[in-house]
């Protein structure tokens, strides 16, 4: 991987974001996702690389494009593995709510954990708390550690939690410490990454979300030097989701074993979920969010706001791009 490839990866998420943004607020989440998938795959196909999707839209028989194992790119050049979520927060996009984005993680071949389509308990925190907070500890313990690491009173901390029934006890425990809870309906990738930047007002992500998105979050947090841990959730009683209504704990363990995951209780560090020598995170806002603005359509241009984080040169680049339309007469400065 090199800087030219990183620039092209940025353009991949920009094009996906623009495609979804045309459907923002129309209540068409599936169509918005499909548009992002098509745009992402098209741009990937123009890159000189031997790309492979390791986390995507589903298994080959479940998804027409960007399925797990699909080869993308020109077929020549460096081998690159991708974990993609072309429209993270499809409901947010459909309802024109904050936090939807096109996002991916990339690494050298074999550098990303091929997470199963399971749930994952997650803990994300700032670099100053790395290795000090721990997913094995209670929320109360971790909040007190965060307070010490950040030099903030517990009452000044904001903890992001997915607004799900399974988190009722977690939310109660957090509030009992005096810390503030920020519930979100979808899109925990952006919330996790926001923990890695000072000034976002987001200090920690706790709770259970999707495992594939956990790998993307881990890639970003590894590159930022932030804290991220994940642990697969296989017990339907803990996940508390209608999607697993017909699943059993024993059946889920068997599924994981079939995938080669024998230590089903393993706690994964960011460096294990994104283990490659070169790791890149790229995200582009579809709607406004914690880290960047959404796509803005203007008469003569389209504006995107994006973030690329890379271990290649240890940088986090916030990029505002003006995509000039044919025949443009006047481009406003901002």
Swiss-Prot record:
Q: This protein's superkingdom?
A: Bacteria
Catalyzed reaction equations:
beta-D-fructose 1,6-bisphosphate + H2O = beta-D-fructose 6-phosphate + phosphate; D-sedoheptulose 1,7-bisphosphate + H2O = D-sedoheptulose 7-phosphate + phosphate
Check the record and name the Gene3D superfamilies matching this protein. Answer: 3.40.190.90, Fructose-1,6-Bisphosphatase, subunit A, domain 1 (3.30.540.10)
Q: Which residues bind Mn(2+) 2?
A: 85, 88, 213
**Which annotated residues bind substrate?**
88-90, 119, 164-166, 186-188
Q: Which GO terms describe its biological process?
A: fructose 1,6-bisphosphate metabolic process; gluconeogenesis; glycerol metabolic process; reductive pentose-phosphate cycle
One molecular function GO term is: metal ion binding
> Which cysteine pairs make disulfide bonds?
none
Where is Mn(2+) 1 bound in this sequence? Answer: 33, 57
User: Pathway, per UniProt?
Assistant: Carbohydrate biosynthesis; Calvin cycle
Which keywords has UniProt assigned to this entry?
Calvin cycle, Carbohydrate metabolism, Hydrolase, Manganese, Metal-binding
**CDD domains in UniProt:** FBPase_glpX
Which cofactors does this protein require?
Mn(2+)
Which Gene Ontology cellular component terms are annotated? Answer: cytosol
Reported EC number(s) for this entry are 3.1.3.11, 3.1.3.37
Which PANTHER family does the entry mention?
FRUCTOSE-1,6-BISPHOSPHATASE 1 CLASS 2-RELATED, FRUCTOSE-1,6-BISPHOSPHATASE CLASS 2
Q: What does this protein do?
A: Catalyzes the hydrolysis of fructose 1,6-bisphosphate (Fru 1,6-P2) and sedoheptulose 1,7-bisphosphate (Sed 1,7-P2) to fructose 6-phosphate and sedoheptulose 7-phosphate, respectively.
Q: Subunit structure, briefly?
A: Homotetramer.
Describe the family membership recorded for this protein in Swiss-Prot or TrEMBL: Belongs to the FBPase class 2 family.
Recorded protein name is D-fructose 1,6-bisphosphatase class 2/sedoheptulose 1,7-bisphosphatase
